[in-house]
């Protein structure tokens, strides 16, 4: 009597995902299990990067290699307990994310499962485990919540991919724009109606111009994570992303639509810097990816962000944030999925004409996952064991940033700015992840261990760091005409101070002349009174106008001391003693609010100029 293969156990009703039913799916058998990598034979017709369900618990995996009828699958869940002979199903679809109202304030894992729902009891009232159970499949967006939809087009109107269909007030300060999906053909709108709808309810139809079958329109749609969303054209990034961090905005600014990395060794402040950027950057939406980092760091974000106010709207900071949590104890293969999930969500909001900032902490953990999976695949290793395709994977990620003109008959401008943390072992910037990232990004904010040991934060090394974004014209037009000149002068003084410090370490400061001592003192003032900034005080965010006032006063004081010493009116030590009240005022600048500094600036500048002319 022939034996029949048992079908996989049914999922609870709220753990469903609308993929191909298992009865129609190509089925294979596991022939090899090596950590997160599984080989299966018999998956005829499977395509590269299709999602596969592995084993009796239907673990989520992705086909990453095909050789005949043998498929190699990287599994995004713990593979403990899998055995040779277990069945594998090809779902017939790539790994995709669900995009629509309900994303903001959401907390997802690397494959977009909503983590808060995993703590709720299942259909039988049984509490969930403290860790994610294997094989759990949850819809990313709430299927029960109804969203009020207001159409922006009428029946019979002609629309194209990317056109605005209507809006949904997702938060009190944010109206979610519902667009024609990018993969839909041009056509006419039919039956679009207002009202309250669930994300998967049909709100109307699109009748294609080419006579094809009519397409349903919904509040949400799906998009493959590895496929960049289409755009009309790229634009030159010429508007800075204001971060509120003086060392970044003044010395090494990044443009909206730009890319940057923050490399640094252990304890140099990568995560705090990324969290500060996520809190205070003037982006419309922030996507924060915790890729392989400690769970406590993600907990800090979850605890702090709901309590913080968005400086632009006054609402909770979580109302503009999407969190992707993929901590270090989660399966390593899911780190790659979390990176692609995050950037696809960022592109979705970009298509709505918004400026999005994506924080990836840390891309090095993604690189480690690539190295581990590559080793399991027995591929030829590259430098330090990383796969040979590391550079192309990084390029594919960072190139999804940019300032773009979106699709649609009325194009919008939107941007995705990618800022990735890099954790080189031992702080060695010559390792492959740092070097390959360095070739791809436009700004490099190098964190220095020595600065961190001296408790100088942000510990961004002003000598090793750089930016390729030329934004002087914007700062000249929107802040002050003197901004580029002051920035260049500050960088020159910091460079000269670093060179003099090397001499001081050899012969001591007493061997220097008074002009050199002036440079050393100004470098000290720039470091302590301007560049140093606490992330846990009212000085955590510094507006551009305040940055200009502070830099203008410090450099005006430098000019006054330099003038006295050069003319011989007084020695350097005498100048320091006589100007003690001015110096105390300079060190207190960071404690002042913008309004206070704006009111005090003319008097402080006049005080410095008066002292420079008469010494008293």
Language-model segments: residues:
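Metallocofactor- and cofactor-centric catalytic cores in central/energy metabolism, strongly enriched
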Residues: 69-71, 93, 183, 187, ...
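Short, surface-exposed secondary-structure boundary micro-motifs
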Residues: 43, 57, 93-94, 112, ...
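P-loop NTPase nucleotide-binding/switch module
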Residues: 121-182, 187-189, 198-259, 273-276, ...
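P-loop NTPase catalytic core
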Residues: 250-251, 257-578
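C-terminal amphipathic alpha-helical interaction region
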Residues: 568-616
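A residue-level detector for short acidic-glycine micro-motifs
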Residues: 29-32, 65-67, 75-77, 109, ...
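Short, surface-exposed secondary-structure edge patches
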Residues: 40-45, 76-81, 96, 104, ...
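N-terminal accessory targeting/assembly segments
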Residues: 2-124, 130-131
């Amino acid at each position: 009597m022939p034996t029949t293969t048992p079908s996989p156990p049914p999922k609870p009703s709220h753990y469903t995902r609308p993929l191909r039913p298992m009865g129609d799916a190509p089925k294979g058998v596991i022939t090899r299990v090596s950590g997160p990598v599984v080989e299966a034979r018999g998956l005829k017709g499977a395509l590269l990067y299709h999602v596969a369900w592995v084993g009796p618990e239907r673990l989520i995996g992705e086909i990453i290699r095909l050789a005949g009828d043998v498929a190699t699958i990287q599994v995004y869940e713990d593979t403990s307990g899998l055995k040779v002979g277990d069945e594998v199903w090809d779902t017939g679809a790539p790994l995709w994310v669900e995009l629509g109202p309900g994303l903001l304030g959401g907390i997802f894992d690397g494959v977009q499962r909503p983590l808060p729902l995993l703590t709720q009891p299942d259909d039988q009232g049984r509490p969930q485990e403290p860790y994610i159970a294997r094989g759990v499949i949850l819809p990313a967006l709430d299927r029960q919540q109804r969203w009020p939809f207001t159409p922006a087009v009428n029946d019979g109107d002609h629309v194209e991919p990317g056109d605005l269909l209507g809006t949904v007030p997702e938060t009190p300060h944010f109206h979610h724009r519902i667009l024609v999906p990018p993969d839909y053909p041009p056509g006419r709108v039919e039956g679009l109606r207002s009202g309250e709808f669930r994300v998967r309810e049909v709100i109307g139809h699109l009748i294609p111009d080419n006579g094809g079958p009519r397409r349903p329109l919904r509040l949400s749609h799906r998009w493959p994570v590895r496929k960049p969303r289409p755009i009309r054209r790229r634009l030159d990034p010429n508007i800075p992303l204001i971060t509120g961090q003086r060392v970044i905005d003044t010395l090494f600014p990044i443009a909206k639509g730009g890319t940057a990395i923050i490399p640094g060794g252990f304890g140099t402040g990568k995560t705090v810097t990324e969290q500060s950027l996520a809190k205070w950057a003037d982006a419309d939406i922030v996507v924060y990816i915790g890729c392989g980092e400690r769970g406590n760091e993600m907990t800090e974000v979850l605890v702090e962000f709901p309590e913080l106010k968005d400086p632009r709207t006054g609402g909770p900071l979580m109302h503009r944030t999407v969190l992707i949590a993929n901590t270090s104890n989660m399966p390593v293969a899911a780190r790659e999925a979390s990176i692609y999930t995050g950037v696809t969500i960022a592109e979705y909001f970009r298509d709505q004409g918004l400026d999005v900032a994506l924080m990836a902490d840390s891309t090095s953990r993604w690189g480690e996952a690539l190295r581990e999976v590559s080793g399991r695949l027995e591929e030829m290793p590259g430098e330090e064991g990383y796969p040979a395709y590391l550079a192309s994977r990084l390029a594919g990620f960072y190139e999804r940033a940019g300032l773009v003109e979106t699709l649609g008959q009325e194009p919008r401008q939107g941007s995705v700015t990618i800022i990735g943390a890099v954790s080189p072992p031992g702080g060695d910037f010559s390792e492959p992840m740092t070097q390959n990232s360095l070739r791809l990004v436009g700004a490099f904010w190098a964190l220095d261990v020595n600065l961190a040991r001296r408790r100088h934060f942000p510990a961004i090394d002003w000598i090793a760091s750089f930016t390729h974004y030329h934004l002087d014209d914007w700062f000249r037009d929107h802040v002050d005409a003197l901004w580029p000149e002051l920035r260049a002068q500050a960088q020159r003084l910091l460079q000269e101070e670093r060179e003099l410090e090397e001499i001081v370490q050899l012969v001591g400061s007493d061997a220097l002349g008074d002009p050199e001592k002036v440079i050393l003192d100004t470098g000290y003032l720039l470091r302590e009174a301007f560049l140093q900034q606490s992330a846990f005080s009212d000085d955590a965010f510094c507006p551009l106008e305040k940055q200009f006032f502070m830099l203008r006063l410090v450099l005006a004081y430098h000019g006054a001391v330099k003038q006295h010493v050069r003319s011989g009116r007084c020695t350097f030590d005498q100048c320091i003693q006589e100007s003690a009240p001015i110096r105390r005022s300079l060190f207190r600048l960071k404690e002042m609010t913008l309004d206070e500094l704006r009111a005090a600036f003319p008097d402080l500048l006049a005080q410095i100029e008066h002292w420079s002319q008469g010494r008293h």
